[in-house]
Amino acid sequence: SNIVISGSSAGAITVMQAEYELCNRTSWAEVLPKDFRYAGVMSFSGAILSRKGEVKYASAPAPTLMLHGTADNLVNYKQIKFFNLGFFGGGKLVKRFEKFGYNYNMYHFIGYGHEIAGSMDTTLDLQLDFIETNVIEGKRRIVEAWVDDPNVYKGVGVQSRKELYSK
């Protein structure tokens, strides 16, 4: 297909989870044709929920762009695990992508929290480059960058859990 799925925060969790379920042909993916594949996945502060321990793909995921703040505690940058139940953020997922040679671009935003979920407009160049090179041209271009830029979007409406849930 020519479909690139993209999401931010809960939407990023949704697109990452959708691709994970599809690659593993779980019951959640049964509604799609057997040969269906996404052309690409773009995640702004996303994660994957696994009920079986470490994230494992039965087939390689579509080219994936991940952007995540290293200090994100709302959608955890690394992981949260309880026995076999785990919630794996971009900082942990990229290690799996690297280990298995998947096609990905990962931008770690040093010291940033969940505000990276709202960075779609300020990271447009990264997105277009990924779509052009990894998706349209089909090149396996791996990028892993640590971004330390005070000019990255720190928009309104991005709150911590404490700010969201305190009275």
Annotate the PLM regions.
Residues S50-G53, L74-N76, I116-A117:
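Extracytoplasmic/secreted cell-surface and envelope-processing proteins
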Residues N73-G89:
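Conserved alpha/beta-hydrolase "acid-adjacent" motif
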